[in-house]
Design a protein with these regions (language model features):
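Cap/lid segment of the alpha/beta-hydrolase catalytic domain
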Residues: 80-90, 109-130
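Short amphipathic alpha-helix adjacent to the substrate-entry channel of hydrolases
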Residues: 87-107
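Amphipathic alpha-helical segments in well-structured domains
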Residues: 91-95, 129, 133-136
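Extracellular/periplasmic catalytic domains that process cell-envelope and extracellular macromolecules
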Residues: 27-29, 49-52, 66-68, 98-100, ...
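N-terminal cap/lid segment of alpha/beta-hydrolase-fold proteins
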Residues: 15-68
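Short beta-strand element of the alpha/beta-hydrolase
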Residues: 68-79
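Bacterial Sec-dependent N-terminal signal peptides
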Residues: 1-20
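Primarily recognizes the serine-hydrolase "nucleophile elbow" in alpha/beta-hydrolase
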Residues: 138-216
Length: 216
């Protein structure tokens, strides 16, 4: 069952020994892997023309940490779905703080919808949220794919995956968590879902599980 967590550590405490300060205190230096490709999909530029966008993420990990099963948390930036970046200062700060506490924190790029600047109707807005939802699901699937094909690469626990974000990113994270069954999709959104790839989307790593366990 999906949970909205205001204090993530309350969930983690029940899973692990935290007597060394892990998950509470900033006890680690941070290693960052920049520009890891996790997928690609069709997007539109500001004029509405299609192009293929490659999707990247930055992975923040506790440095010199030998723990094998670390919680994984994704942060999505804000910007009204028309601007923003995984290198936004607030996202960098969040990822750094969580990695210092022992999490693997990930800042993802997701497809923006600059066409909203000139055409902010409901259909375009719904599609903007849906594209971001599909992209974070692809990023989650990437880690499960790597966990299966190259165990220990990122030292994550695939049973403790969380999402969160700022502003538009928070909206995308919540929707990715709660619109996860086809029968739950409002009738007026069905055509958009079908056009863009259904619940899972087409952003990459299809066939792996995209579920997660809480929203921060």
């Amino acid at each position: 069952m999906l949970t909205i967590l205001t204090i993530l550590t309350s969930f983690i405490f029940s899973q692990n020994d935290c007597t060394d300060g892990r998950y509470i205190e900033e006890i680690f230096n941070v290693d960052v892997q920049y520009g890891i490709e996790y997928g690609e999909n069709i997007n539109q530029n500001i004029l509405g023309s299609d192009f293929t966008q490659t999707l990247f993420m930055d992975i923040y990990s506790p440095e010199n940490d030998d723990f094998e099963d670390r919680p994984l948390i994704f942060f999505m930036y804000g910007g009204s779905f028309i601007s923003g970046s995984k290198s936004s200062p607030d996202i960098v700060a969040l990822c750094t703080k969580y990695a210092q506490r022992g999490y693997v924190a990930v800042a993802i790029d997701y497809r923006l919808s600059p066409v909203l600047i000139f055409n902010a109707n409901e259909e375009v807005a719904y599609k903007a949220v849906l594209k971001a939802m599909h992209d974070v699901k692809a990023a989650i699937r990437y880690f499960r794919m790597m966990d299966e094909s190259s165990p220990g690469t990122y030292k994550i626990d695939s049973n403790r995956i969380f999402t969160g974000g700022v502003s538009a990113g928070a909206i995308a994270a919540v929707n990715a968590g709660y619109l996860d069954q086809y029968e739950e999709i409002p009738a007026f959104l069905l055509d958009d879902y079908d056009e863009l790839g259904g619940i899972e989307g087409l952003s990459g790593n299809i066939g792996f599980d995209s579920s997660f366990h809480g929203i921060v």
